[in-house]
Amino acid sequence: MLAEGEPAIVQIGWAATCVMFSFSLSLVVWGRSGL
């Protein structure tokens, strides 16, 4: 999926997606822990 010479905006987009996914999982875990 990652090609050479890929635009920076695409890499930033993937990074943002990964961050938001991890953040969502953290909220779910913390929510179930009662914090």
From Swiss-Prot:
<keyword id="KW-1133">Transmembrane helix</keyword>
<keyword id="KW-0812">Transmembrane</keyword>
<keyword id="KW-0472">Membrane</keyword>
<dbReference type="GO" id="GO:0015979">
    <property type="term" value="P:photosynthesis"/>
</dbReference>
<dbReference type="Pfam" id="PF03742">
    <property type="entry name" value="PetN"/>
</dbReference>
<protein>
    <recommendedName>
        <fullName>Cytochrome b6-f complex subunit 8, chloroplastic</fullName>
    </recommendedName>
</protein>
<keyword id="KW-0934">Plastid</keyword>
<keyword id="KW-0793">Thylakoid</keyword>
<dbReference type="GO" id="GO:0009535">
    <property type="term" value="C:chloroplast thylakoid membrane"/>
</dbReference>
<dbReference type="GO" id="GO:0045158">
    <property type="term" value="F:electron transporter, transferring electrons within cytochrome b6/f complex of photosystem II activity"/>
</dbReference>
<comment type="subunit">
    <text>The 4 large subunits of the cytochrome b6-f complex are cytochrome b6, subunit IV (17 kDa polypeptide, PetD), cytochrome f and the Rieske protein, while the 4 small subunits are PetG, PetL, PetM and PetN. The complex functions as a dimer.</text>
</comment>
<keyword id="KW-0813">Transport</keyword>
<dbReference type="GO" id="GO:0017004">
    <property type="term" value="P:cytochrome complex assembly"/>
</dbReference>
<keyword id="KW-0150">Chloroplast</keyword>
<dbReference type="InterPro" id="IPR036143">
    <property type="entry name" value="Cytochr_b6-f_cplx_su8_sf"/>
</dbReference>
<keyword id="KW-0249">Electron transport</keyword>
<dbReference type="GO" id="GO:0009512">
    <property type="term" value="C:cytochrome b6f complex"/>
</dbReference>
<feature type="transmembrane region" description="Helical">
    <location>
        <begin position="10"/>
        <end position="32"/>
    </location>
</feature>
<dbReference type="InterPro" id="IPR005497">
    <property type="entry name" value="Cytochrome_b6-f_cplx_su8"/>
</dbReference>
<keyword id="KW-0602">Photosynthesis</keyword>
<comment type="function">
    <text>Component of the cytochrome b6-f complex, which mediates electron transfer between photosystem II (PSII) and photosystem I (PSI), cyclic electron flow around PSI, and state transitions.</text>
</comment>
<comment type="similarity">
    <text>Belongs to the PetN family.</text>
</comment>
